[in-house]
Amino acid sequence: MAKPTRKRRVKKNIEFGVAHIHATFNNTIVMITDVHGNALAWSSAGALGFKGSRKSTPFAAQMAAEAAAKSAQEHGLKTVEVTVKGPGSGRESAIRALAAAGLEVTAIRDVTPVPHNGARPPKRRRV
């Protein structure tokens, strides 16, 4: 029986992209796209093996950003514009990690959605 041929991933040559950092209270997801929004690379704290409350740490966000940047640099990426969404603790450390990984950060934009008093928020925790 013939083996099914796997599609080899095409290496794009893109120099400018957008790094989307989604920092929630539980996890940090870093996705690097081209200017049209087509994904080049992504990583998250959970995908790197962090579990439970360790996913929400700044160190986990830093590791996720480094992994995504390394993967995106294989496509020839050099400069990124950063969009940050969410209130999580990994916002600043993820941006610093992108810059430290060798990507030039040209702009940082906060796109956290702010409700015009929409849905009722979850009740306050009593610990």
From Swiss-Prot:
Disulfide bonds: none
KW Ribosomal protein (keyword) present: yes
Assigned GO CC terms: ribonucleoprotein complex; ribosome
InterPro entries cross-referenced by the UniProt entry: Ribosomal_uS11, Ribosomal_uS11_bac-type, Ribosomal_uS11_CS, Ribosomal_uS11_sf
GO MF annotation: an example: structural constituent of ribosome
Pfam family, one: Ribosomal_S11
One of the GO BP terms on file: translation
Keywords annotated in UniProt: Ribonucleoprotein, Ribosomal protein, RNA-binding, rRNA-binding
Family: Belongs to the universal ribosomal protein uS11 family.
Xref: NCBIfam families: PRK05309.1, uS11_bact
PANTHER family, A to Z: 40S RIBOSOMAL PROTEIN S14/30S RIBOSOMAL PROTEIN S11
Subunit structure: Part of the 30S ribosomal subunit. Interacts with proteins S7 and S18. Binds to IF-3.
Function, in words: Located on the platform of the 30S subunit, it bridges several disparate RNA helices of the 16S rRNA. Forms part of the Shine-Dalgarno cleft in the 70S ribosome.
Name listed for the protein in its UniProt record: Small ribosomal subunit protein uS11
Originating organism: Streptococcus pyogenes serotype M49 (strain NZ131)
Native organism taxonomy: Bacteria, Bacillati, Bacillota, Bacilli, Lactobacillales
